[in-house]
Each structure stands twice: as structure tokens, then as C-alpha cells.
UniProtKB/Swiss-Prot annotation:
SMART domains in the record: FBOX
SUPFAM superfamilies: F-box domain
Protein name: Putative F-box protein At3g17400
PANTHER family membership: BNACNNG10540D PROTEIN, F-BOX PROTEIN CPR30-LIKE
InterPro entries assigned: F-box-like_dom_sf (IPR036047), F-box_dom (IPR001810), SCF_F-box_component (IPR050796)
Pfam families assigned: F-box
Domain named F-box: residues: 1-47
Organism: Arabidopsis thaliana (Mouse-ear cress)
């Protein structure tokens, strides 16, 4: 009986090229051969070329439905029927799918999500399917009195992502996410 790890390299590469980029992390854990193949430069170029071609046909939208955050691919081109496909969903680290999100902000492919309870914030990179959860600095007032934003700051040639929070009195507090953090997001 043939196993997944016994597939010829060209067939394994073809199978892996059909897997969304956001799912490659799980593939790497399948077997050593697939892990090595998924890191191969030619495979990476081929996979990214396919993703780029698909991206040319559809655009991505972040949607909030029933307090859940979804990444959706929408294709409205005339050569195919209009389609809306789920591409990703924000979930919590403790595997509970119930992260009730009240507000969503975005900047250059990063999404800042504010849960209803405001106890912690999350920066989500939908392309890579990675998240960074952190607790805001002290909430001395009612949590919903705050406004949030996400952006970048250039420092020493690096583009650091930065989240900001304002109380309605407009006193900003910030959280810097360094380039090293972004590279791992």
C-alpha cells in the first residue's frame, strides 16, 4: 500500500500546489519529505505564481458576520459565475471558535480585531493565517470608550506595525509590533 510520503516528487509537488498558502503549516507536519518540498525554492515560486494568478481573478474582503471575522475571496469576472469563497477564519488560540469581534481595522494586509470584551486584542495576518494576541495596557475607563487604529512607523529602516488606542479624551497609547514580530506573523 502506498502512503503519502511514498508519492513521486512531481506528484507530491502537484498535490501541494493545490493547497492554500494558509494551510501549508499543517502540511509541513505531515512528513519530512513534504516539509522539505514545501520549503524548496522552485516549489515556492510555482505556488506563489499560482496564488498570484488566482488573486488576479478575485479580490479579498474581510467580513464580520455574527461577531466572527472571515476572509472571503470574491470573483466577479465575466468569464465565470460570480463566486464568494471562504478563505480563512479568525479563531482563538485556545481552539474555541467563539471569539466575538466587535471592531475590525486594517492596514497593508494586517487586520486588528477588537473582541467584544476588549480583554485582549489580536493582529491577524490572513495571508499567512497567523495571529498575535496581546492584552491592552490598563483599561481604567469603560472599554468601549476607546478607539483603535493600526498602521506602520519607519524606524531605522524597518517598518514596525503599531496599534494605537485613544480614550474619547484623545490621549493616545500605543503598542509597537517590531519587524521581527511581523516577520513571524
Amino acid at each position: 500500500m502506498m502512503t503519502l510520503s511514498d508519492l513521486p516528487s512531481d506528484l507530491a509537488e502537484e498535490v501541494l500546489s493545490k493547497i492554500p498558502v494558509t494551510s501549508l503549516r499543517g502540511v509541513r507536519a505531515t512528513c519530512k519529505k513534504w516539509n522539505t518540498l514545501s520549503k524548496d525554492r522552485s516549489f515556492t515560486r510555482k505556488h506563489l505564481a499560482q496564488a498570484k494568478a488566482a488573486a488576479a481573478r478575485e479580490f479579498m474582503v474581510v467580513m464580520v458576520m455574527d461577531f466572527q471575522v472571515y476572509l472571503m475571496g470574491i470573483n466577479l469576472h465575466k468569464d465565470v459565475d460570480a463566486t464568494i469563497n471562504g478563505q480563512g477564519k479568525l479563531i482563538s488560540l485556545d481552539d474555541s471558535n467563539q471569539v466575538d469581534i466587535s471592531y475590525v481595522y486594517h492596514c497593508d494586509s494586517l487586520v486588528l480585531c477588537i473582541p467584544k470584551d476588549c480583554a485582549r486584542l489580536v493582529v491577524w495576518n490572513p495571508y499567512w493565517g497567523q495571529t498575535l494576541w496581546f492584552k491592552p495596557t490598563s483599561l481604567r475607563h469603560f472599554p468601549h470608550w476607546y478607539m483603535y487604529a493600526i498602521g506602520y512607523q519607519m524606524r531605522r529602516g524597518n517598518r514596525d506595525a503599531k496599534t494605537s488606542r485613544w480614550l474619547l479624551t484623545c490621549r493616545p497609547t500605543t503598542k509597537t509590533i517590531t519587524k521581527n514580530t511581523i516577520d513571524h506573523l
